[in-house]
Amino acid sequence: MCIRDRRLLGDASIIRNETKIRAAINNAKATIALREEGGLAEFIWAYQPPENLYPTVMEDIPKKSYESKLMSRELKKKGFRFVGPVTCFALMEAIGMIDTHLIGSHRRGTSGVWLESGVPNYGLAQEYNALANSQTAGADELHGAAS
């Protein structure tokens, strides 16, 4: 374990689990490697399901999906760790890729990712990818190209 990792284990503001710290560092490296294939945003958005969910009660909301299982498997093939299908599904919810807000909720549809017809707003997903890629390029310029 290097000095940086020991310092992280003593940081009370983060999870102090050595395996998870190593996984976070590893996943950052895997994210950088994905830039050669279009970047993490492009990779993630490739798993957007063809239809939205329509939950009317909390029990209708799954913990994982076919797409989150695929995403998890492919992320692991790319070297990512601690990215199971439940974690991938939570990511998909967090970025609006799937809308698990209950029908009738004031939050339903606020991401703009889904059209009222229930099909994806692919134009918006492309805008998200372009924004993510431009921010990645800016970070490279700011910190020097990743090696």
Provide a role label for each language-model segment.
Residues M1-I3:
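Short, small-residue-biased leader/transition segments that mark boundaries at the very start
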Residues R6-L9, I25, S72, K76:
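Amphipathic alpha-helical segments within well-ordered protein domains
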Residues D11-A12, Y66, L70, D99:
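Terminal-region recognition feature
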Residues I14-F43:
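Structured, non-catalytic alpha/beta "coupling" segments that mediate domain-domain communication
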Residues A23-N26, L70, T87-A90:
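Amphipathic alpha-helical interaction segments
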Residues R35-F82:
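Helix-hairpin-helix/helix-loop-helix acidic hairpins
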Residues L75-I95:
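Helix-hairpin-helix
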Residues E93-S134, G138-S147:
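C-terminal end-helix/capping segment
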